């Protein structure tokens, strides 16, 4: 029953991957192009085949592929975050961990309840769960590809040595997941960072541009988070409506065939008036609406929720550098007043000044690019979603008109 979904591997070829789940308006450079050409699922692991084309002299070949796992993507992301040289850049958000537990649990429950349903019902539910699993799998691959493409499109991060090793080194990178101790350390670091962030947030920025961006991003992140939660509820409602319509359609179809009437051809029921299909056309339309909203809206919101957090992290690093610079100025004044350790204080003050200026210089352009990127992505996806919604609305209208015609005896 679970063949190809749990016990066996799942192979995702180029033609099966479909469009990228999230449009992040990547302005790719032909000198370095990265994509995930294939992916293989083996129980709890997903192996991604990362394909690279490049004319850069840093690489030994112009075209090559390597196999990478999720932990290696996280390692690459963390190496960017921990590198002080990249403190002034928005680090592309790490792709979410592959999670197929819910789909596999549903398949297991389906197998346990096989004896209580007809063969037709079992086959139909199995196909639906397989489709759900494949959709999650495609989305997982797409999010990992988006991360790599964002790095490859960045004028600075694309030159990183770790990124080149990730793309070119043919062997396993020997990267493991974090153990409990490391996860606990990360937790405490985040607690300290959150507390420090509250203190830093109260500092008035010396630059109006960054003060405005800080205020805007706090509000923007909150709004996107709220919109993401509401879009998930909306999509869930469409899916529930599709399931309910299909159940009603199946019941009415059975009733219509049992009492010798043509009831099965009324309402939002079969795909054609001659019967033979138990799945309602109205249900199919609702399911397509849910799928399109998930692809064009929910995924976009989830991505930019993570990207806006990365932008907030950039502003935090700059504010932290500003506070350090101001503290260094105070320490220098005290050293001069006491005429003690002046040279050391001057050196420290100069280091803090250089760090703050360097972060500020790159951060401004990063935030401008982020605005351009998100506006373009939202415009594109919302226009496409509106066009799809119109298409589905017309389909619903035609279906209702057809049903009315049948009920009135016009057809």
Regions found by a protein language model. Name each.
Residues 1-226:
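Phox homology (PX) phosphoinositide-binding domain
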């Amino acid at each position: 029953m679970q063949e190809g979904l749990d016990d066996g591997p799942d192979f995702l070829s180029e033609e099966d991957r479909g469009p990228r789940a999230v449009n992040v308006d990547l302005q790719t450079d032909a000198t370095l192009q990265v994509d995930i050409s294939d992916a293989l699922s083996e129980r709890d692991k997903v192996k991604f085949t990362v394909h690279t084309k490049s004319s850069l002299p840093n690489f030994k070949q112009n075209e090559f592929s390597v196999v990478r796992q999720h932990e290696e993507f996280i390692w690459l992301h963390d190496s960017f975050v921990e590198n002080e040289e990249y403190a002034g850049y928005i680090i592309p958000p790490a792709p979410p961990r592959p999670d197929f537990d819910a789909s596999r649990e549903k398949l297991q429950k389906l197998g346990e309840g096989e004896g209580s349903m007809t063969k037709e019902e079992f086959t139909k539910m199995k196909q639906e769960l397989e489709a759900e699993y494949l959709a999650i799998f495609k989305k997982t691959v797409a999010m990992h590809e988006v991360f790599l493409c964002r790095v490859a499109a960045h004028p600075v991060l694309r030159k990183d040595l770790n990124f080149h090793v990730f793309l070119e080194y043919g062997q396993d990178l020997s990267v493991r997941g974090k153990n409990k101790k490391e996860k606990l350390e990360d937790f405490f670091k985040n607690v300290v960072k959150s507390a420090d962030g509250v203190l830093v947030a109260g500092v008035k920025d010396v630059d109006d541009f960054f003060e405005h961006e800080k205020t805007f991003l706090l509000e923007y992140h909150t709004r996107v988070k709220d919109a993401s939660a509401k879009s998930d509820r909306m999509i869930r409602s469409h899916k529930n409506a599709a399931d309910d319509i299909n159940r009603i359609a199946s019941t009415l179809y059975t009733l219509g065939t049992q009492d010798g009437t043509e009831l099965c051809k009324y309402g939002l029921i079969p795909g054609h008036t001659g019967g033979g299909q138990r799945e309602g056309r109205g249900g199919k339309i609702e399911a397509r609406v849910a799928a399109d909203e998930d692809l064009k809206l929910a995924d976009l919101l989830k991505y930019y929720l993570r990207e806006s957090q990365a932008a907030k992290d950039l502003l935090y690093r700059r504010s932290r550098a500003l506070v350090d610079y101001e503290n260094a100025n105070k320490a220098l004044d005290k050293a001069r007043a006491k005429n003690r350790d002046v040279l050391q204080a001057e050196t420290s003050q100069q280091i803090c000044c250089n760090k703050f200026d360097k972060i500020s210089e790159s951060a401004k352009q990063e935030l401008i690019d982020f605005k351009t990127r998100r506006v373009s992505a939202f415009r594109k996806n919302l226009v496409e979603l509106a066009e799809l919604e119109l298409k589905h609305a017309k389909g619903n209208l035609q279906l209702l008109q057809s049903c009315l015609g049948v009920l009135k005896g016009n057809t």
